[in-house]
Amino acid sequence: MSMTRLLCCLVLLLALPLQPACAGLLQDRLEARQLEQAGIRVLRDIAYGNDERQRFDVYLPTSPSRGPAPVIFMVHGGGWANGDKDNGSVALNKALRWVPQGVVLVSTNYRMLPDTPPLAQADDVARALAHAQQLASGWQADPARFVLMGHSAGAHLIALLDAAPEIAAQQGARPWIGSVVLDSAAFNVETVMRGPHLKLYDRAFGEEPTTWRAASPTLRLEQAGAPLLAVCSTRRDDACPQARSFAAKARKLGKRVEVMDVDMSHRQINHKLGRDNGYTTDVEHFLRSVGLLRH
């Protein structure tokens, strides 16, 4: 940042309301300071494709622990049309919580609506996963110990890869050890589209039932695969019923699925994860059970 811009921001701190651009710069500096103090370095905008959205960030311990580190691979939400890997609620709290424990965190972007529909977004996420796994050894991380995590639309994309791992395999990704799905209400897109629903689902999934079925994790699920934790908000009408239906089908296939219903808003489920609270501790029980965190 130039001295002029920094002085501008410091002066504007004395004025109300704070200018949005300046506030963003100050927030970036604050977050960078928090990461530095926690012993975390960040590799920004690693490309896994030619589009400017095909980038991910990597949060690494400044002093790596002994042995290859496990990896959390995080996918942001935003209704398949918005959001970013840099948003504070996506990566910051999670990095501050888990990187000091010896975990590497990857936070990825992907192409979005209106140009890229969810099924192609899942391909992007799978391609990012494959590239992260290929680079993992250079971060002193273990490509065989990835846990996938996503919130909202990102949770749907992670659930889709979990239910249809051939999507990931086609992009060169290796199997992972677990998935954490943070408040998706789109396990069964066909059910959503045949009932009352928000317009964002129309923009994402259109009018073709074949597309609805292809984008439905519950309908695509045919094999056991890695364990999955589905966190759902009891303040929403559809999130927990959708998660339970997915879990019921999974159990018949011998797949381990845990449903964690929480009295939090959709936003809080993402924003509070990584903070020092019982909810984070409960998620960590799952992460330990799949071998990501030490007991």
Regions picked out by a protein language model, each given a short descriptive name:
Residues 130-194:
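Primarily recognizes the serine-hydrolase "nucleophile elbow" in alpha/beta-hydrolase
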Residues 68-78:
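Short beta-strand element of the alpha/beta-hydrolase
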